[in-house]
């Protein structure tokens, strides 16, 4: 009945019911139908959030600070102008970026002058945030399997005034061999996934994603995660920190992937010290 009411494949609803109670499943599916507010991230390489907010408000934009955990996010309530085409946007004063996609970068907590790898980077939202937190120092390798997608990454870096990023296109699984003598202080793997956590952004997932897709993706994620761990410099003062994130809610693509890595590599889970996701 839920599948029919909300337009989902029955097998997907059944899958959600293996993870959540019926009430939670209904709440999740209902919430997934609701549009998210537009969010922008202030580019502190070029401006301050206060100044950006004032500039946008002068253009008639209604906005609020994003949340207590973000010093750079702004939530756009209403706008008479296209947010992706204002003079401030074109000048690189902000990036369109969802609140959820800022969280992995905060968990990664990159420091100035470090070596950082963003393993699945395009179109560069997280990469540019990493560069911003590093104050344009050190080096960030922005990798993506598809060279065509990197055009957007490079364009965004130029617009935002980011100068410490190197864009490359490799199969992440092969990177440990390619970078045999070059290791990283921190690695972010925002892995390719089924997208079951962002159905509001892509409603086609309701009918196009199957359990087979979830399992195939989970297999790829396990390979990528091991490769990401192998890219870490264990002699780094950080000890080598990596963040694994997805935009899926499935246990197969999250907890099970992490448990697999814990069984295959000498690593431990560390507390981010952040209160979201509790």
Residue ranges and their predicted role:
Residues 1-278:
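S-adenosylmethionine
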């Amino acid at each position: 009945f839920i599948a029919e009411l909300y337009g989902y494949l029955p097998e997907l609803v059944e899958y959600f019911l293996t993870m959540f109670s019926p009430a939670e499943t209904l709440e999740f599916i209902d919430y997934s139908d609701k549009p998210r507010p537009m969010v922008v991230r202030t580019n502190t390489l070029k401006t301050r959030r206060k100044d950006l907010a004032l500039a946008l408000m002068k253009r008639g934009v209604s906005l609020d600070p994003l949340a207590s955990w973000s010093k750079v996010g702004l939530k756009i309530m209403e706008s008479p102008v296209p947010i992706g085409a204002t003079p401030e946007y074109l000048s690189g004063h902000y990036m369109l970026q969802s609140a959820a996609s800022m969280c992995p970068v905060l968990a990664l907590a990159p420091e100035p002058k470090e070596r950082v790898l963003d393993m699945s980077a395009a179109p560069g939202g997280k990469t540019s945030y990493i560069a911003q937190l590093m104050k344009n120092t050190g080096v960030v390798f922005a990798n993506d399997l598809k060279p065509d997608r990197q055009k957007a990454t490079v364009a965004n870096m130029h617009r935002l005034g980011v100068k410490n990023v190197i864009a490359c296109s490799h199969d992440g699984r092969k990177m440990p061999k390619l970078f045999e003598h070059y290791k990283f202080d921190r690695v972010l793997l925002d892995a390719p996934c089924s997208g079951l956590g962002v159905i509001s952004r892509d409603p086609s997932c309701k009918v196009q994603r199957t359990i087979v897709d979830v399992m195939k993706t989970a297999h790829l994620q396990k390979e990528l995660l091991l490769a990401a761990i192998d890219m870490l410099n264990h002699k780094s003062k950080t000890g080598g920190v990596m963040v694994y994130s997805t935009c899926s809610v499935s246990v197969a693509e999250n907890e099970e992937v992490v448990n697999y890595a814990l069984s295959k590599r000498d690593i431990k889970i560390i507390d981010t010290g952040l209160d979201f996701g509790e």
